[in-house]
């Protein structure tokens, strides 16, 4: 059978491409290495809850055309990601914003927060210079030079070491290029205008995109090059 397009991978990109191609009367074959479609946004339904197996994934965009498109396939809720960190029984809002700084230091204005952060950064840099350190040698020194000691110790160090399975002093500084800081009272993790998660899970979105399109799972393209000749 002749296909116009062989699409490797049934994640969001591959599924949208197949959907758009089908709208133009192109015949597509989608092959997927895993035993399920959806790529990294695949959901497993556990006890009635759609669990993001490779997640979590929150859809966010400021492009109304993109937002209208995905909502034409499946309805999205208005989930807003506002994480909270628990450090020794005390809660802190993330990402770093004025709510975080109030919880940490009791400051209420951006100027107070900036002075606190800059003061800690200055002390850290002076201590490094006394030891003959010109540039941060590891992630710990890099993070402190960007955000100060308190935020690093409370909200970065433990999480990062758990994530990488190594001490921050053993990790290279380039892992953290920058640390976003907001001097406003806003706990929204993203800055985009439109945010949410598909009602019914991401599988519903992928199924809608791949409706009436031929899909083969458990097919590794690199081990099944014959699909190139279809």
Predicted regions and their residues:
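Core beta-strand elements of the Rossmann-like FAD/NAD(P) dinucleotide-binding domain
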Residues: 2-3, 224-230
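Active-site/ligand-binding neighborhood in enzyme catalytic cores
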Residues: 85, 90, 99-227
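Dinucleotide-binding Rossmann-like beta1-alpha1 core, especially the glycine-rich loop
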Residues: 47-122
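N-terminal Rossmann-like FAD-binding beta1-loop-alpha1 element of flavoenzymes
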Residues: 3-30
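Conserved beta-strand segments of alpha/beta enzyme cores
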Residues: 27, 50, 75, 214-216
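Short glycine-/acidic-enriched loop or helix-start segments at secondary-structure transitions
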Residues: 17, 40-41, 226-227
